[in-house]
Design a protein with these regions (language model features):
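Short beta-strand element of Class I
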Residues: 71-74
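A short glycine-rich, Lys/Arg-flanked "PGG" loop and its adjoining helix->strand segment in the class I
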Residues: 139-153
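Conserved SAM/SAH-binding beta-strand->alpha-helix loop
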Residues: 79
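Class I SAM-dependent methyltransferase "Motif I" SAM/SAH-binding loop
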Residues: 54-56
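Conserved beta-strand signature within the Rossmann-like core of class I S-adenosyl-L-methionine
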Residues: 154-161
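S-adenosyl-L-methionine
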Residues: 1-49, 59-66, 87-114
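Class I S-adenosyl-L-methionine
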Residues: 177-224
Length: 224
Protein backbone atom coordinates (compact mmCIF):
# COMPACT_ATOMS: atom_id res chain seq x y z
CA UNK A 1 0.00 0.00 0.00
CA UNK A 2 1.40 3.38 -1.02
CA UNK A 3 1.99 6.15 1.50
CA UNK A 4 -0.68 8.34 -0.14
CA UNK A 5 -3.24 5.57 0.17
CA UNK A 6 -2.32 5.02 3.83
CA UNK A 7 -2.63 8.72 4.56
CA UNK A 8 -6.03 8.80 2.88
CA UNK A 9 -7.21 5.92 5.04
CA UNK A 10 -5.81 7.47 8.23
CA UNK A 11 -7.64 10.71 7.44
CA UNK A 12 -10.86 8.87 6.65
CA UNK A 13 -10.63 6.91 9.91
CA UNK A 14 -10.71 10.24 11.74
CA UNK A 15 -14.18 10.87 10.33
CA UNK A 16 -15.62 7.46 11.26
CA UNK A 17 -17.81 7.35 14.36
CA UNK A 18 -16.95 3.67 14.84
CA UNK A 19 -13.18 4.20 15.06
CA UNK A 20 -11.32 5.11 18.26
CA UNK A 21 -7.65 6.15 18.06
CA UNK A 22 -6.45 7.28 21.50
CA UNK A 23 -2.87 8.41 21.89
CA UNK A 24 -0.71 6.26 24.13
CA UNK A 25 -0.64 8.91 26.86
CA UNK A 26 -4.45 9.03 26.86
CA UNK A 27 -4.42 5.38 27.87
CA UNK A 28 -1.50 5.10 30.28
CA UNK A 29 -1.32 8.52 31.92
CA UNK A 30 -5.00 8.89 32.78
CA UNK A 31 -8.17 6.82 32.83
CA UNK A 32 -9.26 6.48 29.22
CA UNK A 33 -12.73 7.93 28.72
CA UNK A 34 -14.11 4.72 27.19
CA UNK A 35 -12.63 2.35 29.77
CA UNK A 36 -15.50 0.63 31.53
CA UNK A 37 -18.04 2.49 29.40
CA UNK A 38 -17.91 0.94 25.93
CA UNK A 39 -21.44 -0.44 26.10
CA UNK A 40 -22.97 2.61 27.76
CA UNK A 41 -21.24 5.33 25.72
CA UNK A 42 -20.92 3.76 22.29
CA UNK A 43 -23.16 0.72 21.84
CA UNK A 44 -25.93 2.08 24.09
CA UNK A 45 -26.91 -1.36 25.38
CA UNK A 46 -25.86 -4.06 27.86
CA UNK A 47 -25.10 -6.79 25.33
CA UNK A 48 -22.03 -9.04 25.72
CA UNK A 49 -18.79 -7.35 24.65
CA UNK A 50 -16.45 -9.31 22.37
CA UNK A 51 -12.95 -8.27 21.26
CA UNK A 52 -10.91 -9.38 18.26
CA UNK A 53 -7.20 -8.81 18.85
CA UNK A 54 -4.96 -8.14 15.87
CA UNK A 55 -8.05 -7.76 13.72
CA UNK A 56 -6.24 -6.81 10.50
CA UNK A 57 -8.80 -5.72 7.92
CA UNK A 58 -11.61 -6.30 10.39
CA UNK A 59 -13.29 -9.02 8.35
CA UNK A 60 -13.85 -11.34 11.30
CA UNK A 61 -15.19 -8.60 13.57
CA UNK A 62 -17.61 -7.37 10.92
CA UNK A 63 -18.89 -10.83 10.06
CA UNK A 64 -19.27 -11.83 13.70
CA UNK A 65 -21.26 -8.63 14.23
CA UNK A 66 -23.55 -9.55 11.34
CA UNK A 67 -23.96 -13.07 12.67
CA UNK A 68 -24.61 -12.03 16.28
CA UNK A 69 -26.57 -8.74 16.32
CA UNK A 70 -27.18 -9.13 20.07
CA UNK A 71 -23.47 -8.92 20.86
CA UNK A 72 -21.09 -5.96 20.63
CA UNK A 73 -17.74 -6.34 18.85
CA UNK A 74 -14.54 -4.31 18.90
CA UNK A 75 -11.70 -5.07 16.50
CA UNK A 76 -8.30 -4.00 17.82
CA UNK A 77 -5.13 -3.43 15.79
CA UNK A 78 -2.23 -0.99 15.85
CA UNK A 79 -2.48 -0.51 12.08
CA UNK A 80 -5.45 1.71 11.37
CA UNK A 81 -4.93 1.60 7.61
CA UNK A 82 -5.76 -2.09 7.78
CA UNK A 83 -8.99 -1.97 9.75
CA UNK A 84 -10.14 1.01 7.68
CA UNK A 85 -11.76 -1.56 5.39
CA UNK A 86 -13.79 -3.14 8.18
CA UNK A 87 -14.81 0.21 9.64
CA UNK A 88 -15.92 1.51 6.24
CA UNK A 89 -17.86 -1.67 5.49
CA UNK A 90 -19.66 -1.42 8.84
CA UNK A 91 -20.71 2.14 8.03
CA UNK A 92 -21.72 1.34 4.44
CA UNK A 93 -23.79 -1.65 5.55
CA UNK A 94 -25.18 0.05 8.70
CA UNK A 95 -23.79 -2.51 11.14
CA UNK A 96 -24.21 -0.79 14.54
CA UNK A 97 -22.68 -3.42 16.81
CA UNK A 98 -19.04 -3.25 15.72
CA UNK A 99 -16.32 -0.66 16.38
CA UNK A 100 -12.55 -0.49 15.96
CA UNK A 101 -9.80 0.57 18.35
CA UNK A 102 -6.30 1.50 17.23
CA UNK A 103 -3.84 0.56 19.97
CA UNK A 104 -1.23 -1.99 20.96
CA UNK A 105 -2.53 -5.25 22.40
CA UNK A 106 -0.14 -4.74 25.33
CA UNK A 107 -2.34 -1.83 26.43
CA UNK A 108 -5.61 -3.76 26.50
CA UNK A 109 -6.04 -3.38 30.26
CA UNK A 110 -5.71 0.39 29.88
CA UNK A 111 -8.52 0.49 27.31
CA UNK A 112 -10.94 -1.86 29.10
CA UNK A 113 -11.97 -2.19 32.75
CA UNK A 114 -11.91 -5.31 34.89
CA UNK A 115 -14.81 -7.65 34.09
CA UNK A 116 -15.85 -5.55 31.08
CA UNK A 117 -15.24 -8.14 28.35
CA UNK A 118 -17.18 -11.36 27.77
CA UNK A 119 -15.11 -12.96 25.04
CA UNK A 120 -11.87 -12.51 23.10
CA UNK A 121 -10.92 -13.75 19.64
CA UNK A 122 -7.35 -13.99 18.37
CA UNK A 123 -7.41 -14.69 14.65
CA UNK A 124 -4.33 -15.66 12.65
CA UNK A 125 -1.71 -13.94 14.81
CA UNK A 126 1.97 -13.83 13.88
CA UNK A 127 3.29 -17.01 15.59
CA UNK A 128 6.63 -15.32 16.40
CA UNK A 129 8.42 -18.65 15.98
CA UNK A 130 11.92 -17.52 16.95
CA UNK A 131 12.66 -18.06 20.65
CA UNK A 132 13.71 -14.45 21.18
CA UNK A 133 10.26 -13.41 19.94
CA UNK A 134 8.41 -15.48 22.56
CA UNK A 135 7.43 -12.35 24.49
CA UNK A 136 5.51 -11.15 21.44
CA UNK A 137 3.36 -14.27 21.05
CA UNK A 138 -0.21 -13.24 21.73
CA UNK A 139 -0.94 -16.29 23.88
CA UNK A 140 2.13 -16.17 26.12
CA UNK A 141 1.73 -16.05 29.90
CA UNK A 142 2.02 -12.27 30.17
CA UNK A 143 -0.62 -11.65 27.54
CA UNK A 144 -2.96 -14.15 29.20
CA UNK A 145 -2.61 -12.20 32.46
CA UNK A 146 -3.65 -9.02 30.67
CA UNK A 147 -6.63 -10.71 29.07
CA UNK A 148 -7.74 -12.11 32.42
CA UNK A 149 -7.80 -8.59 33.87
CA UNK A 150 -10.49 -7.44 31.46
CA UNK A 151 -12.45 -10.69 31.05
CA UNK A 152 -15.44 -11.54 33.20
CA UNK A 153 -15.11 -14.55 35.50
CA UNK A 154 -16.73 -16.85 32.94
CA UNK A 155 -15.13 -15.13 29.93
CA UNK A 156 -13.77 -17.25 27.11
CA UNK A 157 -10.86 -17.03 24.67
CA UNK A 158 -10.75 -18.19 21.05
CA UNK A 159 -7.60 -18.82 19.01
CA UNK A 160 -7.95 -19.52 15.29
CA UNK A 161 -4.70 -19.95 13.36
CA UNK A 162 -3.06 -21.57 10.37
CA UNK A 163 0.14 -22.01 12.41
CA UNK A 164 0.53 -25.53 13.77
CA UNK A 165 3.38 -24.15 15.87
CA UNK A 166 1.11 -21.53 17.49
CA UNK A 167 -1.60 -24.13 18.06
CA UNK A 168 0.80 -26.55 19.74
CA UNK A 169 2.58 -23.86 21.74
CA UNK A 170 -0.72 -22.51 23.08
CA UNK A 171 -2.13 -25.92 23.97
CA UNK A 172 1.06 -26.81 25.82
CA UNK A 173 1.03 -23.53 27.72
CA UNK A 174 -2.63 -23.86 28.66
CA UNK A 175 -2.22 -27.39 29.99
CA UNK A 176 1.05 -26.51 31.73
CA UNK A 177 -0.43 -23.52 33.55
CA UNK A 178 -3.71 -25.23 34.45
CA UNK A 179 -6.06 -23.25 32.24
CA UNK A 180 -9.28 -24.87 31.02
CA UNK A 181 -9.32 -26.05 27.41
CA UNK A 182 -12.97 -26.19 26.36
CA UNK A 183 -12.40 -27.35 22.79
CA UNK A 184 -9.45 -27.95 20.48
CA UNK A 185 -9.43 -28.90 16.80
CA UNK A 186 -6.35 -29.45 14.66
CA UNK A 187 -8.17 -29.08 11.34
CA UNK A 188 -11.54 -27.35 11.59
CA UNK A 189 -12.61 -28.04 8.01
CA UNK A 190 -11.89 -31.75 8.09
CA UNK A 191 -12.73 -32.77 11.66
CA UNK A 192 -16.31 -32.97 12.89
CA UNK A 193 -17.67 -30.78 15.64
CA UNK A 194 -16.15 -27.44 14.64
CA UNK A 195 -18.17 -24.47 15.96
CA UNK A 196 -20.21 -22.87 13.19
CA UNK A 197 -18.72 -19.40 13.68
CA UNK A 198 -15.25 -20.88 13.13
CA UNK A 199 -15.99 -22.39 9.73
CA UNK A 200 -18.64 -20.02 8.36
CA UNK A 201 -16.41 -16.93 8.50
CA UNK A 202 -13.24 -16.82 6.42
CA UNK A 203 -10.82 -13.93 6.03
CA UNK A 204 -9.03 -13.14 2.77
CA UNK A 205 -5.80 -14.66 4.02
CA UNK A 206 -7.57 -17.71 5.41
CA UNK A 207 -8.88 -18.44 1.93
CA UNK A 208 -5.32 -18.30 0.64
CA UNK A 209 -4.13 -20.69 3.37
CA UNK A 210 -6.90 -23.12 2.45
CA UNK A 211 -5.90 -23.00 -1.22
CA UNK A 212 -2.42 -23.99 -0.03
CA UNK A 213 -3.96 -26.93 1.87
CA UNK A 214 -2.83 -25.54 5.21
CA UNK A 215 -4.93 -26.86 8.12
CA UNK A 216 -6.79 -24.22 10.11
CA UNK A 217 -6.70 -24.91 13.85
CA UNK A 218 -8.87 -23.66 16.70
CA UNK A 219 -8.80 -23.60 20.51
CA UNK A 220 -11.50 -22.33 22.88
CA UNK A 221 -10.40 -21.91 26.49
CA UNK A 222 -10.81 -20.16 29.82
CA UNK A 223 -7.98 -18.47 31.69
CA UNK A 224 -7.71 -19.61 35.30
Amino acid sequence: MGSKNKLKRFNENETFDNVFQPKREELVEATYKMKGHWNAKYFKNDNPLVLELGCGKGEYSVNLAKKYPNKNFIGIDIKGARFWRGAKTAIEESIPNVAFLRTQIELIDYAFAENEVDEIWITFPDPQIKYKRTKHRMTNSEFLKRYKKVLKANGVMNLKTDSEFMHGYTLGLLHGEGHEVLYANHNVYKQEGSPEEVTSIQTHYESIYLEQNKPITYIRFKIK
